[in-house]
């Protein structure tokens, strides 16, 4: 996959998974020390990075993430003995899949750090933001999502009512 420069105004959407031990403590320490990191990163907790499923990583891209990373305990210091090593193996496998489908394995990363490494936690977010900004938006974002519940959405020009023009109606609002 070739790297293309994109607008500086492109703000990537990044999903970060972190374990409840070192990853969470690093995030908490960063907050306590007021260490700044990009606001474009959405964090999701895992019991352990060893519980990371390749499907979760790939689904994050399907849901529109431009980049994904994991924050794991340091190698040899996992609270679940080898969970971080299992997480690394799953990231490696998911990278190969991303390369095979043409999305690019460089959009996925794993960082190892202890709970006291607040600056490393922030640096991981900065590193991924810069990398994804260089790579550009997730090409899957250009593909329209499937309609809810498998229903066909009306196409402008059909005889059907197209008043919502691709927007899904709010099911909580009553229509008379």
What are these regions (language model features)?
Residues 1-176:
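Iron-sulfur-associated redox domains of electron-transfer enzymes in respiratory
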């Amino acid at each position: 996959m070739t790297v293309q420069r994109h607008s500086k105004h492109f703000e990537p959407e990044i999903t970060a998974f972190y374990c409840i031990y070192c990853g969470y403590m690093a995030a908490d320490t960063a907050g306590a020390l007021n260490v700044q990191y990009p606001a474009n990163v959405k964090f999701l907790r895992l019991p352990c990075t060893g519980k990371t499923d390749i499907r979760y990583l790939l689904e994050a891209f399907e849901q529109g993430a431009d980049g994904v990373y994991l924050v794991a305990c340091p190698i040899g210091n996992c609270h679940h003995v080898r969970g971080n090593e299992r997480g690394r193996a799953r990231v490696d496998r998911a990278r190969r899949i991303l390369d095979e489908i043409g999305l690019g394995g460089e959009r996925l990363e794993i960082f190892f750090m202890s709970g006291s490494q607040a600056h490393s936690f922030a640096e991981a977010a900065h590193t991924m933001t810069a990398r994804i900004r260089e790579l550009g938006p997730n090409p899957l974002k250009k593909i329209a999502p499937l309609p809810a519940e498998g229903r066909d959405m009306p196409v402008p020009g059909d005889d059907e009512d197209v008043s919502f023009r691709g927007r899904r109606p709010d099911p909580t609002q009553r229509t008379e």
